[in-house]
């Protein structure tokens, strides 16, 4: 156990990741790839999403995209500055791009995705200096769950 895993901040990461896992279970029930996501602003969950690509027959119905859409509507702004996204699986290139474009402040990831992950596995779009916005990334929260 590292120092970070024992901190109050890490416990908060686990709390919200558990809700993202609950969202992933909703996708699983629909026979979707079980990925879940929540977005937190000022200590409150403002949006939830889960993978619905097959159900919606829509390429962009990933958990992160669904949650970003709901969070933007809730805040009345496309900018999600000050928001933290909790997602059960490392975002793909589409979702990573949307996260950067939405100006999400932090992304907390459960498991990495060595096949298509764009927060450090295949690419790291979230922390690229070349973009006008970089996202703080925390990896490995409740990875075994």
Please identify what each model-predicted range represents:
Residues 1-30, 94-145:
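Zinc-dependent deaminase
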Residues 31-35, 81:
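Short, basic and Ser/Thr-rich N-terminal targeting/leader segments
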Residues 35-43:
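Short beta-strand scaffold segments in enzyme catalytic cores
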Residues 41-42, 69, 81:
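A cytosolic small-molecule/anion-sensing beta-strand core signal
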Residues 55-65:
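A short, polar/charged loop-to-alpha-helix boundary motif
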Residues 77-89:
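Immediate flanking context of iron-sulfur cluster ligation sites
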